[in-house]
Amino acid sequence: MTARMHGARSLARAVAALAAMAAPALAAPEASDVWSDLREGLEAYGYAVEAGTEEVGGDAVRLEDLVLSTETRGETMGPDGEMAASVTRITLTLARAGLTEEGDGVVVTLPDEIPIAIETEVEGADPVVLRGRLRSEGLDVAVREAEAGLRYAYASDVQTFELDEFEGSEGTLDLAIRLEAFAGETLTGRAGTDRTTTQSQRADRATAEVQFVDPSPDGGSIDLAFALADLVGTGETRVPEGAAIADPGLTARAGGRIAGDVDYGDTRLEIAVDGPGGALDVSSTSAGGALNLSLGADGIVYGLQTEGSAVRLRGEQLPIPELSYTVERSALDVLVPILAGDAPQPFRIAAALTGLDLDDAIWDLFDPRAVLPRDPASLDVALSGNATVPEDLVAPPPGEDAPTPGADAPSGEDGDAGEDAPAPELVELDVERLDLSAAGARLSASGALSAVEGGTPAAPGLPPLAGTLAIDLTGVEGLLDGLVEMGLLEPERSAFARGMLGFVARPTGADAYASEITLGGDGSVTANGMALR
């Protein structure tokens, strides 16, 4: 399964490489200059470019047997669940391609059908090979001059990818991806010697269908159908000379940047699983969302938002025939520094789950008499701070020193490379907010903590920290009463919990408490000035 997922990511890179055929250029839009720049752009994606026949003359460039190939080495999950050396090779073959000067621009002509082969080798596993075809209907690509470089405009009625062959597994795999009413524009230029691009793209609809069947006695099948509407994407890249988008680590080290945002409308996901344990059907819809990703010297930023989600599960192994729930909004925002440095670097992680509303059938499993309030639950967490990064968190550029499946990997004193690599060290942690509400109770917290050099951790697994957290609790006594009434909590344990609550917190109202937890850095912990440790 891991190899197949690895192949899917490789397919995305292959499609991105084809998009580059309708992207970067620098000089005036003459056919030969555009072709030279297209080659440079493909190489920026990590592809080797070889043409069986290349004719440059007059106002046109004609290419035959154009082969784009790339090889990526690294590590992925092996068949035994451990990290293993891997190599992925992608090959695209274009029977013919051409660039022709027409009017005030250059028209790029690509085949209606392009074969793609993706081969993945993972140490200890059989190679996995995917072969398919990328097809375009009504594809138009035109290149014209812009103030700061070149403007590439491209559009197609339909773009599809269909899998023809799947080798390396006893099962069978069918895969079809479809993009409708796709259009976009790319502006290219230079910032010094750095290559820059600015892109905007949109599509009316995208769909994917996947079917996998394992014929073994303990096997089964998975059917997946996914659709989303109204895709709108924007992106920017700044790639220093000698770097490549295919190697984001090198790009970041050289001061480059890669960023992209995608907004989308209604989505639908249908999954049907059938196996020895029975059948399971999952359906999910949402009213839309957004995805953003960027990488640069300041780190990796990842953001995800989803609005109006609804999930339904049906299956023989479920405790009831159907489980369902809705979520008003979910979001994730993460910044992770990736380059080594002596100075502290900022990080953040924020997650929100608003309006989690469980269907009554789920509530009835553990609370059939509706003792607890069934209001939607919510979670909102935002943490930020600074940390030092002793070693790069991104892999070095792949090349001669990259691991190869079946070859001896470099080892340290203990025989395992990377096991003793120092982890990032926390310097400051700011708990901007922590807000959890469910079943009529609510917990809120905020505060700031700092690492103490040479101090004593307050708990195993934590660095020595000093600082204060302010905590507010409401509805806890009502929750304890409800759990006792439901028979989920013994009265003695409820009494003990109330006693601890009175010890570490002070009452601020009816079923409301507040507490200040202070860490001393020397291992001491106090609550409202009273020593806990």
What positions do the PLM features span?
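Gram-negative bacterial Sec-dependent N-terminal signal peptides
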Residues: T2-A27
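Glycine-rich, small/hydroxylated-residue low-complexity segments
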Residues: A28-R533
